[in-house]
Amino acid sequence: MTEAPPLPKRRVLLAQPRGYCAGVERAVDTVEKALELYGPPVYVRKQIVHNKHVVAELEAKGAIFVEEADEVPEGSIVVLSAHGVAPSVYEQARQRRLKTIDATCPLVTKVHQEARRFAEQGLEILLIGHANHEEVVGTTGEAPSSITLVDGPEEAEHVQVKDPSRVAWLSQTTLSVDETLQTVEVLRRRFPQLIDPPSDDICYATQNRQAAVKRIAAIADLVIVVGSRNSSNSARLVEVALDSGAKASYLVDDASEIDERWLDGVWTVGVTSGASVPESLVTGVLAWLAERGFDTVEEIDAERETLVFALPPELRRELKARGEPLTRSATAGDRMNADR
């Protein structure tokens, strides 16, 4: 009697890079450093980053999250989120005599600068992004009369401009790289003189995480993306995984949201996380999988990240005035290694 061939070994393919990017690390450090310097409460307009666990942890330390600056008591400290804000928010904060600490990601600030420069040149700006996303709202506020939102290739087919020879494009930093390229292709076909931004607006971390998930999706039966549902870059990772060959892909905030039925007939599970996800949540998912026989973990490298952003100038000035070192609480790599 012929013996049946051995079953494949259950394994996990772990994407690298994953989790915190430099902008998120800086934003979280900003709130923590403000709490350390000034003591609680420190107010934060909007979620500092789009992850409910990070927000809850900062709330436990004394941060108070509000939707708008007019909810902050006059004269208080307010941190502005990593996603950026419109100029009107700075004015509102000034009128309320708030001490503002700007945690906007420097890569988002770059897009704001490009929007102002294009508008000053009299160009019409087609902003590729998702309506009502905080980053899009902030960028649009830099030049509201010059910006038209374009949400994907289909809208690009129908958007109207005043002068096709005077059009530029920008994009939200957390979009699908492939879909953004498709959208730009449509715009360039319709407006051949379309002006590009000086450099790619989609951030390095978004691109790297999408490249990594493409590699694991091509050989995984299932891809689990750790991230909150309001995180644009996390949601895009699910889309990229499905487009890149994964039979199934799901977004979970943590291991408690995994459905055991997803593992039926699955031998290889890919795991990654969005740019606002602490490594401890990924560790929890790996432990959950290990309990179910997926205890072999192979890290799949797409890119090694070393970028670190300095703290906002408001905090650096305060630290200097107090004679304290201009240090960050930890780098993303330090936190990742500590969690693991």
Curated annotation (Swiss-Prot):
Q: Where are the transmembrane segments?
A: none
Give the Enzyme Commission number.
Answer: 1.17.7.4
Question: Keywords, A to Z?
Answer: 4Fe-4S, Iron, Iron-sulfur, Isoprene biosynthesis, Metal-binding, Oxidoreductase
In which residues is [4Fe-4S] cluster bound?
C21, C105, C203
- What catalytic activity does the UniProt entry give for this protein? isopentenyl diphosphate + 2 oxidized [2Fe-2S]-[ferredoxin] + H2O = (2E)-4-hydroxy-3-methylbut-2-enyl diphosphate + 2 reduced [2Fe-2S]-[ferredoxin] + 2 H(+); dimethylallyl diphosphate + 2 oxidized [2Fe-2S]-[ferredoxin] + H2O = (2E)-4-hydroxy-3-methylbut-2-enyl diphosphate + 2 reduced [2Fe-2S]-[ferredoxin] + 2 H(+)
Q: Which Gene3D superfamilies match?
A: 3.40.50.11270, 4-hydroxy-3-methylbut-2-enyl diphosphate reductase, catalytic domain
Name the cofactor(s) required for activity, per the record.
[4Fe-4S] cluster
**Which residues are named in the active-site annotation?**
E135
Tell me if Metal-binding is a UniProt keyword of this record: yes
- Keyword Oxidoreductase applies: yes
Q: Where is this region: Disordered?
A: 320-340
Please give the function described in this protein's UniProt entry.
Answer: Catalyzes the conversion of 1-hydroxy-2-methyl-2-(E)-butenyl 4-diphosphate (HMBPP) into a mixture of isopentenyl diphosphate (IPP) and dimethylallyl diphosphate (DMAPP). Acts in the terminal step of the DOXP/MEP pathway for isoprenoid precursor biosynthesis.
HAMAP family reported in the protein's UniProt record: IspH
Q: Which family does it belong to?
A: Belongs to the IspH family.
What's the protein here called?
4-hydroxy-3-methylbut-2-enyl diphosphate reductase
- In the UniProt record, what gene is named as encoding this protein? ispH
